[in-house]
Amino acid sequence: MKLANNFLSAMGMAGSSEAIAMGVKAGLDPSIMCDVINAGSGMNTATTQKFPRSVLPGSFDYGFGMALMVKDVRLFLQEAEAFGIPLEVGRAVGTIWEKALAEHGPQSDFTELAKTVEKGAGIEMRAKKK
């Protein structure tokens, strides 16, 4: 159960990072994007907690290590593969987390995955100063 839960958390963080990056690239405010997403069906813990607390302010200090998240994603993929689960989405999630681990190191916070997406998109997802 823990592996399934943490895989869903990893998937939510990765997908939310890409979705918000697309909006920022299109000129949207990432804080407002989170507010709108959180009022709809796309809401998840990345948009309700991780982005507002760690990504938008740029602190990247949510308190869960990159190495721990990648370990759980790897274990989930191994177990799911052993059960014959197709894993089209799972492999993609695993790939982006492995990339984030390589870029930011095992001691980094797992929210730094957003930096990997930012780098690829050529943007930053920070709260706009008022």
Predicted region positions:
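Segments forming oxygen-rich coordination pockets for charged ligands
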Residues: 16, 95, 125
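Extracellular cysteine-rich, disulfide-bonded domains and loops characteristic of secreted proteins
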Residues: 116-124
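Helix N-cap / loop-to-helix initiation motif
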Residues: 27-30, 86
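Active-site-proximal catalytic alpha-helix in oxidoreductases
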Residues: 1-26, 37-50, 67-71
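Interdomain hinge/lid region at the active-site interface
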Residues: 8, 49-111, 117, 129
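Beta-strand segments within the central parallel beta-sheet cores of soluble alpha/beta enzyme folds
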Residues: 31-39, 91-95
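ATP-dependent carboxylate/acyl-activation modules
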Residues: 124-130
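Residue-level marker of structural boundaries
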Residues: 42-43, 98, 122
